[in-house]
A protein has these predicted regions:
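Glycine-rich beta-strand-centered segment in the early N-terminal region that forms part
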Residues: 25-43, 54-94, 100
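Short pre-catalytic strand/loop immediately N-terminal to key active-site residues, enriched for Gly-Thr
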Residues: 120-127
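Short gly/ser/thr-rich secondary-structure transition/capping motifs
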Residues: 16-21, 54-55
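Conserved hydrophobic/aromatic beta-strand scaffold that supports enzyme active sites
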Residues: 21, 70-72, 86, 105-107, ...
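A structural motif shared across PLP-dependent enzymes of the aminotransferase-like
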Residues: 95-110
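Short structural boundary motif marking the start of a folded domain
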Residues: 2-8
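Cytochrome P450 core scaffold surrounding the K-helix E-X-X-R motif
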Residues: 47-48
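Single conserved hydrophobic/aromatic residue that forms the stacking wall/gate
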Residues: 129-138
Length: 138
């Protein structure tokens, strides 16, 4: 039997975007060689845009937002990480058109992940991440 998990998923119904928590199957996750059990994900501006249907952020619905995630490796097909390693994934396409950190599990290319730095908790890592605002270049 396939393992299931919970995810916040946004669906498009006509011109309206609705979010709800659904049970999903691990086999529904996208292709990738790294599967991570998510412990934390932060909520930021891009997540709000994705949940509201902003085409510049997410083009394909239904979709799970969450542009960053921190958690433990449960499977790595290329051996770049071991079971139980703590990793951070942020940026790339996570939470945009690749199912993101608002699910209890994600699957991504292993090149998207970095090891959690020593001395930093998983919780702290999501508190520290902030995406640059458009005004940061002044």
């Amino acid at each position: 039997m396939d393992k299931t998990f919970l995810a916040y998923q946004v669906e498009k119904k006509r011109d309206t975007f609705l979010g709800k928590v659904l049970e999903r199957s691990i086999s529904d996750l996208p292709k990738g060689n790294l599967t991570v059990k998510v412990f934390y994900s932060s909520l930021n501006y891009k997540d709000a845009l994705s949940a509201c249907g902003a085409k510049g952020v997410t083009r394909n619905y239904p979709h799970t937002p969450g542009i960053d995630a921190v958690g433990e490796v449960v499977d790595c097909l290329d051996n770049s990480f071991e079971y139980g390693d703590k990793v951070i994934i942020t940026g790339y396409d996570l939470g945009m058109d690749t199912a993101g950190g608002f699910g209890q599990y994600i699957r991504v290319p292993s090149s998207w992940a970095v090891p959690l730095p020593a001395g930093l908790s998983m919780y702290e890592s999501c508190l520290l991440y902030t995406s640059p605002s458009p005004r940061d270049d002044r």
